[in-house]
Amino acid sequence: MSGRLWCKATFAGYKRGLRNQREHTALLKIEGVYARDETEFYFGKRCAYVYKAKNNTVTPGGKPNRTRVIWGKVTRAHGNSGMVRAKFRSNLPAKAIGHRIRVMLYPSRI
């Protein structure tokens, strides 16, 4: 069995008020989640923004490649339509808005 261990999500933007945006919290739209009560399953799940950079870097136990990852965690729901808030180790870059975020199906809380 080799399937995906992650769900597809889209980085919709940063948490914001009318005039200020808070870049330390990202808003994610998870595919197939359309109500606030459905988001509870994803609380505490790890999420990752995977991207390609210009230069190779060495990963422990692997070959040098251009792939990089920013890790984060889903923290809570945002609104009533299935959006969630996530905090990343370093803030997501603005160029990531509209791009794919992987929401891992671990750690399990069941």
From Swiss-Prot:
Gene3D superfamilies per record:
translation elongation factor selb, chain A, domain 4
Superkingdom of source: Eukaryota
Q: GO terms for biological process? A: cytoplasmic translation; ribosomal large subunit biogenesis
Keywords, A to Z, come to:
Cytoplasm, Ribonucleoprotein, Ribosomal protein, RNA-binding, tRNA-binding
Q: What does this protein do?
A: Component of the large ribosomal subunit. The ribosome is a large ribonucleoprotein complex responsible for the synthesis of proteins in the cell.
* Subunit comment: Component of the large ribosomal subunit.
* Name this protein carries in UniProt: Large ribosomal subunit protein eL33
**Organism expressing this protein natively:** Xenopus laevis (African clawed frog)
Q: What is the lineage of its organism?
A: Eukaryota, Metazoa, Chordata, Craniata, Vertebrata
